[in-house]
Design a protein with these regions (language model features):
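Bacterial N-terminal signal peptides that target proteins for export
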Residues: 1-11
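C-terminal segment of classical bacterial N-terminal signal peptides
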Residues: 14-22
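Short, low-complexity N-terminal intrinsically disordered segments enriched in polar/charged residues
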Residues: 23-62, 176-177
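N-terminal, post-signal-peptide region of Sec/Tat-exported proteins
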Residues: 51-79
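Surface-exposed, charged secondary-structure patches
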Residues: 70, 74, 80-133
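Short, surface-exposed coil-to-beta transition loops
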Residues: 105-108, 137-144
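Short beta-strand edge/turn micro-motifs at domain boundaries
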Residues: 140-169
Length: 177
């Protein structure tokens, strides 16, 4: 009988730990998606980190709606522009190892939010650095976020970005704080 009670109490204790750990993870995830500001911040945080630092790709993936895309504009050799499209898992597959190996910090320096009902569009000007302590960014550009709120939380539907270049400097209206 004592052995049975000991086993039962151990099972209950472990179950309680697992449930509280799961509840804590859910609370943490909800903090990331409870507002427009929090989901934008979480997106930047999830991809940023020092060289050799693993990213929390589960956190990153949890930000995106089913069918979400990440797209960017590139200039081709002939001078034309094209768009490359990735899913969140495709982005992790194509860029994750490089971000972790080389270090990458992306910070928002300006934001314009337009929203209506349960949708929002955010123009988010960013600066990218290899180390958090770098004084000058190696790249800047604009991330165009499209978000949806399902009544419970915000979801990233798409991120579409273009890096700044000599032929397309960022307009001052997207740089002021």
């Amino acid at each position: 009988m004592n052995k049975w009670l000991l086993t039962l109490s151990g099972t209950i204790f472990i179950g309680t730990l697992l449930l509280s750990s799961s509840a804590e993870a859910q609370r943490t995830e909800m903090v990331d998606v409870e507002s427009i500001g929090s989901i934008i911040t979480a997106t930047y945080d999830a991809i940023s980190g020092s060289a050799g630092e693993a990213r929390d790709w589960d956190r990153f993936s949890n930000l995106f709606a089913e069918g979400a895309t990440l797209s960017y504009v590139t200039r081709d050799e002939d001078g034309s522009y094209s768009r490359t499209i990735r899913t969140p898992s495709g982005y992790i597959e194509s860029s994750g190892a490089s971000l972790e190996r080389n270090g990458f910090f992306e910070n928002e320096i300006h934001q314009v939010v337009e929203s209506y009902g349960m949708i929002a569009h955010i123009f988010s000007t960013y600066e990218s650095r290899r180390r958090e302590s770098d004084t000058e960014p190696f790249a800047r550009g604009i991330n165009s976020f499209q978000l949806m709120n399902d009544g419970n939380r915000w979801w990233v539907v798409s991120i579409y970005w273009q890096s700044e270049g000599a032929e397309n400097p960022i307009p001052s209206r997207y740089l002021s704080r």
